[in-house]
Amino acid sequence: MVVGEGLLSAARFALRVVACGNALSLALKSNLGRSFSSFPAWAEYLIADSFENSGAFESDGGGGRITQRCALRPSGRCLRQRSLADARAEP
């Protein structure tokens, strides 16, 4: 009877492994349809951080600098924002 109990235990364990594998496969398959953009989310954050850290400065022709930043929209697309850095008010 000891051998029979061991085989029964091994069969139950094998069924649990298969069931967990099936559940994981279904979870991954259902999450694939939920992506809103072709870009992975971590890559969007890296791009946004690199734009913020680099600053991407250009001149406005009057001595000030125009700063461009990339902000993420809820849709996952990049929204470029321009602001005038070091702006001086003329009298």
Swiss-Prot record:
Stated name of the protein: Protein YchS
